[in-house]
């Protein structure tokens, strides 16, 4: 969902903020606003404040926003709604480990800040046009909030607390995916693969800043540019991610550890979902797996992960390619495409090149606004708290 339309944007911004506030209320009701330190997550109150801060930083405070990607970042910004906002919520300057020690706003004040930030954003959006370069920043803050919304599910799962991810219904099936959130209650009797022929493949998004008006991609992240041509040799790839039946066979055969939130009960298995244990659906994709876990499985199964280009090609050319239930690890290290130029939010991609692995697809907790076949997610290879799985290619 990357359409340039002010009405669409306005509705999406309001809807997403509603989900963000509902998520915050879950943590508040569960008395989990000050959880134990976790290097991959943030305290919920800091998360909410950061989302509100990020929105006003790039919209209301950004006097250069009308220039879009040509904005001069050296120019001063307007003052924040909060005097302490930059000192509290600027993720580029506030060290992660210190966020647990900050004396932040009370929960009602956090909520008020989030509401005020949204209100001024919507007021400014009403004065924009559908093809204004400024819309880049509105889309940026929308997608940023969707990322943090998904992270709230990671946090709730790690805390084993009750949690309602109401936005799941809106993310059920992405427009350009094939049964992305398939009904895994249906028994899957086989594990299908498909062969993709050798070809030159264009990887990445079109540069919307230089295309003609009728052919513009309204938004993309800087790491998706510049579209490049890759030479792909023919390969065979699974049409679905590895499921629990397959992964548990690997665990039983090798003695490899069970993933987080999975336990064996006699001869069967259960999974913990937001603090509630329930029977494991073995037809569902295996999840909460690190890149390291996928490598161990591939050695055992005599297969490999797809490269990022192979995943991209298969997702866009194979009719029955299912994606969108779990983020899928690829072989590739997160690197810039040739000709990469950082967008105004320079901290988004550039600091992480060379240290993270690329994941493609989406998870069941990825909001519809973030679901896009070109989207490049990236995490360090040991992360298994995220909703990550994988599919395989034949050797």
Question: Which residue ranges define each predicted feature?
Answer:
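Short aromatic-cysteine micro-motif
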Residues: 107-118, 221-254, 271-318
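Flexible inter-domain linker/hinge segments
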Residues: 160, 164-201, 207
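Acidic/His metal-coordination segments adjacent to aromatic residues that form catalytic metal sites
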Residues: 94-106, 278-279
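Short, contiguous alpha-helical
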Residues: 10, 15-18, 25, 30-90, ...
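Core domains of carbohydrate- and sulfate-ester-processing enzymes
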Residues: 75-96, 190-199, 258-277, 348-363
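Cytochrome P450 core scaffold surrounding the K-helix E-X-X-R motif
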Residues: 204-223, 244, 249-250, 256-257, ...
């Amino acid at each position: 969902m990357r359409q340039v339309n002010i009405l669409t944007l306005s509705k999406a911004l309001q809807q997403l903020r509603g989900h963000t506030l509902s998520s915050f209320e879950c943590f508040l009701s569960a008395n989990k606003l000050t959880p134990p330190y976790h290097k991959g997550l943030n305290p919920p109150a800091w998360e909410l404040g950061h989302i509100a801060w990020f929105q006003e930083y790039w919209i209301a405070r950004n006097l250069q926003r009308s220039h879009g990607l040509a904005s001069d970042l050296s120019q001063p910004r307007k003052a924040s709604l909060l005097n302490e906002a930059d000192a509290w919520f600027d993720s580029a300057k506030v060290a992660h480990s210190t966020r647990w020690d900050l004396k932040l706003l009370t929960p009602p004040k956090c909520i008020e800040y989030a509401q005020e930030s949204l209100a001024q954003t919507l007021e400014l959006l009403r004065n924009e046009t559908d093809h204004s370069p400024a819309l880049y920043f509105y889309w940026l803050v929308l997608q940023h909030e969707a990322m943090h919304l998904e992270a709230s599910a990671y946090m709730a799962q790690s805390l084993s607390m009750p949690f309602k991810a109401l936005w799941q219904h809106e993310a059920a099936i992405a427009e350009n995916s094939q049964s992305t959130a398939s009904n895994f209650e249906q028994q899957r009797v086989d594990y299908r693969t498909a062969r993709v022929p050798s070809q030159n493949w264009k990887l990445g998004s079109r540069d919307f800043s230089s295309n003609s008006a009728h052919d513009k991609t309204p938004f993309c992240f800087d790491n998706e540019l510049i579209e490049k041509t890759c030479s792909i040799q023919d390969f065979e790839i699974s049409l679905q991610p590895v499921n629990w039946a397959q992964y548990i066979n690997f665990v039983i055969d090798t003695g490899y550890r069970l993933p987080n939130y999975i336990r064996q009960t006699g001869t069967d298995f259960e999974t913990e979902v937001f603090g509630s244990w329930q029977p494991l659906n073995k037809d569902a994709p295996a999840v909460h797996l690190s890149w390291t876990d996928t490598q161990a499985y591939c050695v055992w199964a005599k297969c490999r992960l797809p490269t990022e280009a192979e995943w991209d090609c298969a997702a866009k050319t194979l009719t029955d390619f299912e994606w969108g239930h779990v983020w899928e690890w690829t072989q590739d290290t997160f690197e810039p495409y040739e000709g990469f130029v950082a967008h105004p939010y320079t901290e988004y991609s550039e600091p992480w090149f060379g240290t993270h692995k690329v994941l493609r697809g989406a998870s069941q907790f990825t909001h519809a606004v973030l679901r896009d076949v070109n989207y490049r997610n990236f995490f360090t290879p040991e992360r298994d708290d995220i909703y990550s799985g994988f599919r395989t290619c034949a050797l």
